[in-house]
């Protein structure tokens, strides 16, 4: 039992208290304080605010979309990575624009310090180095927290962003230690406090790979992976990335690596029974990869530098909790790493989380008013997912403090909406990671138009300034104006046009056809027709891409918007009690099983079942509508 202390020497009443200062906590503390709430951020170590505990990178498939959404809403992650990145890439550019995604390697320590300095500059934000061991609750309402050193701090809004620190346990072979990260203490009291108020807790597991010394690697024999020559920023406020970029490198596991892993599987905590918790399905350990994909002769390994000055390299793709001596052999079995020195071992970590179905879409707990959860405490994995949740929780606190109706992010308007919807209605069975495939309306949720979709919400709360908001509106007014012009411009003979036709090898065209039809050809880019649109020549690459995509995918976008309206109309559609799910062509086996078990009464309820995807709901809708039409015609 922690003895309470009377603390008159520093303020002990706040509008909002944020517990934990990882990516969820940093975003939550920034948004709450920026929005005018007197906020306290409590973390066990002020030197690890914004720390990249695992990979030194931000963004990626779907994750990059969320970073841009967080930025559009006034968050800090996009700005920080633009200022601290060491390699920038736009992923998936060979595919459709809906899945293009920015990713950047970070200068790891610089990123962390930039987050800390950004928070320190907020006038409404105080910071304390301590832990929180107990929630103070009266009549199912949070009234404050009690810290590890016995101080009581009072507030009606608490955001828990505890990461992997709740009753956590680190594993390296048979070695175990109660750490939240390697060599950092766990927090036990808070788990007990949550359980005391009947919040459903579970256990999850994650892991991290070893870090190696750059000077012990023969980089000359490895494949080089460079960044983009013209990198795209994450933040809508960043005009251009001018930082020096450095390469990553690629190697592969091999037969020797796999043999070594198989021979030592009994020493892996995951396979010895030492770890019982569920790990991330989409970020498996190297042990899992070798066992689950036994037919694969090799697995790709990325060597990612952790900064300009440090010699540490992150081995992306080799997450492991094997004993350290085995890790050394494993690493040295890789091409180019025959003499590699491990400076930090890989490890697995088990930790408590709270079932996210305990939450409202605002991320407030259903059982305790004023208590919000964000990040890995909700069963997610990833910096970007955490940042998005921290922002949502802080938005909810601000709306509560200002007596505004809560802001509920829709699946049809943001990846953040998809994330929150999946968590609170479907829950998690393993650490949740965002993918573009989770968003049924991803063509509308492109990374380039996050400002158009969401910036208005940040502006309304004072989190986005007038200049940024006006700049966004001006941008889309320009795009819309030129788009309307494109519909009217006929193709006419000219030397420039003939040169373009010859260059592209185009013969099947007609003079008089409108420019929009010509632009819809896959080989034609907006830059190719700038001689017809001189005003576009001064635009940014992003603005040109937006214009081009809206022309090329006009039909698909229009159909998607119509589908959203149509589906919203039928969310309350009743599912017949005698429905035969097995008879619905295309319905997945898992969906059939879950639907038969839960027996949802409406389409909306069906979509809230874990294992039932949006595509399954679409099939249900078409089936029910088809059946009704047949019955109507028969009668």
Swiss-Prot record:
Location in the cell: Cytoplasm
Q: Which GO terms describe its molecular function?
A: flavin adenine dinucleotide binding
Q: Which SUPFAM superfamilies match?
A: FAD/NAD(P)-binding domain (SSF51905)
Q: SMART domains from the xrefs?
A: GIDA_assoc_3
> Which Gene3D superfamilies does this chain map to?
FAD/NAD(P)-binding domain, GidA associated domain, C-terminal subdomain, tRNA uridine 5-carboxymethylaminomethyl modification enzyme MnmG/GidA
Q: Does the keyword Thylakoid apply?
A: no
Please give the GO cellular component terms listed in this UniProt entry.
Answer: cytosol
| Record's subunit section | Homodimer. Heterotetramer of two MnmE and two MnmG subunits.
What this protein is called in its record is tRNA uridine 5-carboxymethylaminomethyl modification enzyme MnmG
Source organism per UniProt: Leptospira borgpetersenii serovar Hardjo-bovis (strain JB197)
Give the source lineage, highest ranks first. Answer: Bacteria, Pseudomonadati, Spirochaetota, Spirochaetia, Leptospirales
Which gene carries the instructions for this protein? mnmG
């Amino acid at each position: 039992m922690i003895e309470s202390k009377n603390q008159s020497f520093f303020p002990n009443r706040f509008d909002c208290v944020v517990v934990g200062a990882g990516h969820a906590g940093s975003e939550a503390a920034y948004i709450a304080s920026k929005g005018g709430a007197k906020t306290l951020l409590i973390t066990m170590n002020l030197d690890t605010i914004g720390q990249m505990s695992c990979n030194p990178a931000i963004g990626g498939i779907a994750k990059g979309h969320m970073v841009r959404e967080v930025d559009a809403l006034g968050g800090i992650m996009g700005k920080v990575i633009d200022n601290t990145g060491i390699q920038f890439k736009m992923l998936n550019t060979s595919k459709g624009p809906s899945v293009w995604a920015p990713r950047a390697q970070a200068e790891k320590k610089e990123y962390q310090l930039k987050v800390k300095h950004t928070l320190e500059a907020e006038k409404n934000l105080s910071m304390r180095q301590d832990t929180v061991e107990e929630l103070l609750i009266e009549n199912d309402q949070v009234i404050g927290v009690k810290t590890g050193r016995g101080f009581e701090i009072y507030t009606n809004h608490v955001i828990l962003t505890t990461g992997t620190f709740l009753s956590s346990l680190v594993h390296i072979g048979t070695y175990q230690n109660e750490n939240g990260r390697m060599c950092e203490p766990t927090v036990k009291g808070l788990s007990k406090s949550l359980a005391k108020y009947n919040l459903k807790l579970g256990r999850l597991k994650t892991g991290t790979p070893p870090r190696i010394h750059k000077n012990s690697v023969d980089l000359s024999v490895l494949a080089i992976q460079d960044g983009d020559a013209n990198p795209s920023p994450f933040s809508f406020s960043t005009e251009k990335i001018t930082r020096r970029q450095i390469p990553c490198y690629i190697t592969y596991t091999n037969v020797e690596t796999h043999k070594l892993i198989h021979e030592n599987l009994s020493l892996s905590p995951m396979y010895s029974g030492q770890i019982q918790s569920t790990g991330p399905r989409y970020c498996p350990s190297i042990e899992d990869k070798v066992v689950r994909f036994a037919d694969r002769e090799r697995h790709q390994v990325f060597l990612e530098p952790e900064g300009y000055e440090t010699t540490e390299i992150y081995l992306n793709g080799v997450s492991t909790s094997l004993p350290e001596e085995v890790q050394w052999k494993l690493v040295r079995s890789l091409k180019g790493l025959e003499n590699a020195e491990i400076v930090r071992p890989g490890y697995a970590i088990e930790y408590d989380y709270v079932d996210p179905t305990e939450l409202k879409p605002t991320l407030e707990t259903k059982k305790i008013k004023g208590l919000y959860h964000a990040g890995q405490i909700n069963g997610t994995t990833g910096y970007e997912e955490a940042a998005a949740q921290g922002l949502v929780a802080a938005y909810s606190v601000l709306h509560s403090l200002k007596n505004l109706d809560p802001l509920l992010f829709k699946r049809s308007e943001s990846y953040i909406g998809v994330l929150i919807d999946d968590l609170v209605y479907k829950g998690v069975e393993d650490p949740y990671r965002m993918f573009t495939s989770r968003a049924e309306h991803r063509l509308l949720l492109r990374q380039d138009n996050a400002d158009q979709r969401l910036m208005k919400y940040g502006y309304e709360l004072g989190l986005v300034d007038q200049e940024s908001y006006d700049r966004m509106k001006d941008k889309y007014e320009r795009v819309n104006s030129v788009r309307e012009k494109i519909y009217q411009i006929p193709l006419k003979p000219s030397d420039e046009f003939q040169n373009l036709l010859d260059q592209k090898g185009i013969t099947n065209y007609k003079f008089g056809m409108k420019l929009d039809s010509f632009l819809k050809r896959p080989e034609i880019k907006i830059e190719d027709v700038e001689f017809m649109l001189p005003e576009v020549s001064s635009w940014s690459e992003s603005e040109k891409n937006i214009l081009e995509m809206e022309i090329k995918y006009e039909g698909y976008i229009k159909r998607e918007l119509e589908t959203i309206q149509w589906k919203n109309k039928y969310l309350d559609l009743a599912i017949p009690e005698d429905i035969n799910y097995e008879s619905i062509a295309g319905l997945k086996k898992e969906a059939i099983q879950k639907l038969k078990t839960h027996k949802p009464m409406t389409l909306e309820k069906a979509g809230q079942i874990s294992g039932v995807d949006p595509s399954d709901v679409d099939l249900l809708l078409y089936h029910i509508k088809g059946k009704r039409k047949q019955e109507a015609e028969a009668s």
